[in-house]
Amino acid sequence: MLKLIKIEIEGFKSFADPISINFDGSVVGIVGPNGSGKSNINDAIRWVLGEQSAKQLRGLNMDDVIFAGSKTVKPQEKAMVKLTFKNEDAIEETKQIFTISRLLKRGQGTNEYFYNDQPVRYKDIKNLAVESGISKSSLAIISQGTISEIAEATPEQRKAVIEEAAGTSKYKLDKEEAQKKLIRTNDAIDKLQGAIKELERQVNSLDKQASKAKIYLEKSKALESVEVGLIVNDLNFFNEKLNNLNTSLLEVEQQRNDLELNIQTYESSISQTVHFKTEVESSIQEITSKLDNLKNALSEINLQEARIEERRKLIISGEIVVDQKTKIEEIKKQVESLKIQINASKQREIELDQQLTRLNAKANSLKLQENDINKEIGVLLEKKSAAAANINILKQQFENKSFLSKGIKTIKDNSFLFDGYIGLASELFKVESEFSLAIETVLGAALNQIVMKTSEDVLQAIDFLKKNLSGKATFIPLTSIKEREVREDHLLVLKGQKGFLGVAKELIEFDTQFNKLFGFLLGNILVVDNVDNANRIAKILDHKYTIVSLEGDLFRPGGTITGGSKLERTSILNYDIKIKEHTNTLKFAEDQIHDLKIKQQTIYNEIETVNSTIQQVKIEANSINSKLNILNEELNNLKLNASEIFKEQQEDQESLNLSFDSEKLNIEKQISTLTIELNSKKDRLTNLISEQGKGETKKQELDAKLRKLNTQHSDSITEQNRAKFLVEQNQKRLSEHYKLTLEAASEQYSLDLDIEQARHFVDSLKKELKELGNVNLEAITEFEEVNQRYQEKKQYIEELTTAKSKIEEAISDLDKIIINKTTEIVNLVNNEFNMVFQKMFGGGKAEIHFTDKNDILNSGVEISAQPPGKTIKNLRLFSGGEKAIIAISLLFAILKARPIPLCILDEVEAALDESNVIRYVEFLKLLKENTQFLIITHRSGTMSRVDQLLGVTMQKRGVTSIFSVELSKAKEMLKDELK
């Protein structure tokens, strides 16, 4: 027999102080005034045995079982109840003693259970209670309300008490669990059948798709084996063609530059010829003018001769009478007038000579300037040619990316494969030339590191490099890096330092989306003007930061210094700078050539103007000289007095004629000489025109060659672009479709077929693949996965069907056990019930029976009772006391038929009269050998017959105390209730 030997309570309900109750007898009475906390002992035992309902413990929530405090005692923070049991059936040496306990802390809402002070689960306590028969069942804890419930219960409700006695609770729980499993199994089978039907439809569809996909893959594999080799062949061909075109373009560029130099030389020569032609034309104009003047002078002489002859004839004939005095006066006036004209002519001649000298000097100066300009243009054309050649070389190197490592070049060439690709670090910012060396020095290899969005993108790129055996590359995933910065207090110190130019990040230009990137790369890098200031600032900051000078001297944290002469740099940044420098040189040369040609044309125009002015001055000077000679001659004639004139006119007529003859002869000689010179100049002009024509013809030939070269250059560029496009298309096909680089493809594939055969084979396979239409390549994997799920679910539904059969079989077995045990207990109880009933009533008869013997599982249990001298059979018609005795008799019959270790009776005899109380207690004594009773009572008949009596009172208000008490003392305690 299992016996409760001790209960310990602390902080549970009214038990504020720790109490320990030892139970010495098999029937223990617990007495005390109403409200003293007797029933709290019942609640404490119910609670420790696993009661989960606060309502059953007369509270709103579980924290209500913790002592809430009183006016004199503060609240407790926890409730703990411990029950100690002893197994009396074991031999003395091995009698087992064990404890079960439960602990609840205020506000935590979690209960802790212990077995022998070791933490266990609620389930463990529940199982222990059920197995040992000390559970919180309706038989283990019986109150006055329980008695009424049994008496007033329906047959179905009453059957629950019988089933507890039968011990079918475990089997009913097992059955309920099995039924739940059966429902779940049926639900699972229903769901599986729907899923299997859908999977079967998918399997059939995917099977067709997978077959089509396999054909597609086979043809694709065959296509790949040839097309990749063909692409490699085409790429090699077009790359070689590109190299040849690049070389050809460089040669064409050089030829164009040479032709431009030759054309410039011819343009200069033609310009000089035009200049000489202008001079000759000017000379011809001058000679022609002189000839015209001489011819005019000759005509004048002939005219004078005619006038003199006419005058002579008139004088001889006496027709002219000369008034000497008047004539002299006229002559004087003419002389004065002629003198004024002569002086004016001489002055103008001097001015013209001076102007001519100045103009000749200016013409010479302009010719010298023209020569200098031609030399400058020649030098600039050479610079232009060199700059253009350098730009082409740099662009070719840049396009080939020869300065990048294999891994970086591979990723850059195939960047379109990676959604997270952003670019090389050097491509994402701009820097002024002043800071370029410093920034490039401090970044070093990081310039060519590849910036990606995430670390997953980096892993994808690394996998691509490994797969294609394309070397290594360093990556910067934006999501993984953290910005670096200079402390605010250090910045305040730096702002006042000589030579400090700024934080490197602030000296470059970049898109705001890369703020984190350049914070990571340059956020804590300081830029200083020279090495001395860098050294000084490094010491001030205790070598905490990397410092770089404009010359590229590097001071690293910790104190190391790197410096020396500049080396050739090979980054994209450097290529950009070099190309920009050469482009600027080319632009400057082109602008200078343009400006010089404008200046040269201005000089040409000015030379033309000067030559024209010189010609006009010379013509004017010749005219003045001729006029001056005539005036001087007239003046000399006028100086002769009238008589002398008259005399001379008569006497020297022949001499004057001779003078005119002499002058005419002289003029004719001059005309002859000038005519010869004029013819010579005309010949020279003809030669110059011919020379100019040849030069222009040659220039036109060179222009034609240049146009041809330009056309050739344009055609080569078009062909180059086409070749580049085809290279890009083939590389894209290779990368996107086959995930291969050219190097990897070259190593893995070779073309065994003739080129044309290969192209025909590829075209044919592509056509066949196209004819297949839309192909779901995932269908193969999907088919395997779906088919596997289909087979698994088919197998699972078979297992569930088997399990369902087993569950149904188990339920059937459990039903048999429940029926057998229930039938057995009803028979056993019936055997005891009539005997107990007769003892309690002093005769009569009673029995229990199923309401439906054909359906015991669902049948209720009815009580038939007939006390002595009465014929009443309906329980509802009995008095309250009679119903209580009938219910107690049934409970005692059950306990006798199926004893339990512990039974708590809470004022169950309250409705009995004193004689029946005595019968009630005496019968308990008959049961105490197999069951321990804790009786909460107010009845003296009960108190006087128990083995041990415990008193319950509240010595402190609101706090329950327990102690052993004698019967007389107990009656004293309960005198008010006994009245």
Curated annotation (Swiss-Prot):
ATP binds at residues 33-40. It comes from the Bacteria. Its main location: cytoplasm. It is found in: Cytoplasm. The keyword ATP-binding applies. SUPFAM superfamilies: P-loop containing nucleoside triphosphate hydrolases, Smc hinge domain. Keywords: ATP-binding, Coiled coil, Cytoplasm, DNA-binding, Nucleotide-binding. Residues 169-400, 572-716, 750-818 form a coiled coil. GO terms for biological process: chromosome condensation; chromosome segregation; DNA replication; sister chromatid cohesion. Residues 419-538 form the SMC hinge domain. One of its GO terms (cellular component) is cytoplasm. GO terms for molecular function: ATP binding; ATP hydrolysis activity; DNA binding. Belongs to the SMC family. Required for chromosome condensation and partitioning. Homodimer. Contains large globular domains required for ATP hydrolysis at each terminus and a third globular domain forming a flexible SMC hinge near the middle of the molecule. These domains are separated by coiled-coil structures. This is Chromosome partition protein Smc. The gene is smc.
